[in-house]
């Protein structure tokens, strides 16, 4: 057994100023590429994303885009992660400002409807991606399914908190309640985006009230949710966050 020198702490040392500037610039460039790719994916779908297409919309070379991701697959996964982070910020974390129970659950649904309204002209990557990758396997599908599952878990947790507060029947299956709420959003997206039904948002709101009433809850109708087809804050404009949903 040979003697080895003590481990170096070079990796923990701060980068020289020029190195930091290069690192920050590289991170900013990658973030700009992902932002452009997310906007493109909302129009043409995840499957339509390619290194060449993103290079064209960003004005970069293909090799420049490739250097940040290494593959088309990693580019797609990066877009899914970014969409997930922004979705959490605009829908989930905003609702966390409300109290436990029905106020938080209602805020989740209201925020989700606002987001769906904002995506009528661009599309929801969770929904369009499910159509594109439902019969496929691989890392892209896994990343997409993991993001959706994380969000569904957060929704179910909000239902369980409402049950714990005695605002929804504790005998009810929280998975079933969350399933029905999720179904409303899917129906809203289909009716508003594909069928251009101007009453889709109001019908989704009424459906949510019916779900709560059926399971022993009551809800105050929101006043801030825009009507179907009206503009709302675009998802791609929401600041990014890297937190995981809390269990609180």
Model-predicted regions and their roles:
Residues 36-37, 58, 162, 178:
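Small-residue (primarily alanine) positions within well-ordered alpha-helices
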Residues 28-39, 43, 56-57, 74-97, ...:
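Alpha-helical structural segments
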Residues 139-149, 163-210, 215, 219-231, ...:
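Hydrophobic/aromatic-rich alpha-helical bundle segments in the mid-to-C-terminal region
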Residues 58-69:
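Short hydrophobic/aromatic patch on the recognition helix
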Residues 104, 118-139:
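Amphipathic alpha-helical segments used for helix-helix packing
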Residues 1-44, 48-57, 74-77:
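Basic, helix-initiating cap at the start of DNA-binding domains
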Residues 1-28, 218-248:
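N-terminal intrinsically disordered/low-complexity leader segments
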């Amino acid at each position: 057994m040979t003697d080895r020198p003590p481990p170096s702490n070079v990796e923990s040392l701060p980068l020289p100023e020029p190195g930091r500037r290069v690192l920050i610039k590289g991170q900013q460039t990658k973030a700009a590429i992902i932002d452009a790719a997310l906007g493109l994916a909302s129009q043409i779908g995840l499957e339509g994303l390619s290194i060449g297409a993103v290079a064209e919309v960003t004005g970069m070379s293909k090799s420049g885009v490739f250097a940040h991701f290494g593959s088309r697959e990693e580019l797609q996964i990066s877009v899914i992660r970014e969409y997930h982070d922004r979705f959490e910020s605009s829908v989930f974390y905003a609702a966390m400002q409300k109290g436990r129970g029905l106020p938080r659950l209602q805020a989740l649904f209201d925020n989700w409807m606002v987001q769906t309204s904002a995506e009528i002209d661009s599309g929801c990557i969770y929904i369009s991606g499910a159509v594109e990758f439902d019969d496929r396997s691989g890392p892209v599908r896994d990343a997409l399914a993991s993001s959706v599952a994380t969000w569904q878990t957060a929704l179910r947790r909000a239902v369980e908190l409402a049950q714990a507060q005695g605002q929804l029947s504790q005998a009810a299956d929280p998975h079933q309640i969350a399933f029905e709420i999720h179904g409303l959003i899917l129906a809203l997206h289909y009716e508003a985006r594909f069928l251009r039904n101007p009453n889709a948002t109001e019908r989704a709101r009424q459906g949510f009230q019916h779900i709560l009433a059926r399971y022993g809850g009551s809800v105050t109708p929101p006043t801030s949710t825009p009507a179907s087809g009206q503009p709302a804050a675009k998802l791609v404009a929401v600041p990014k966050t890297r937190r995981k949903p809390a269990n609180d």
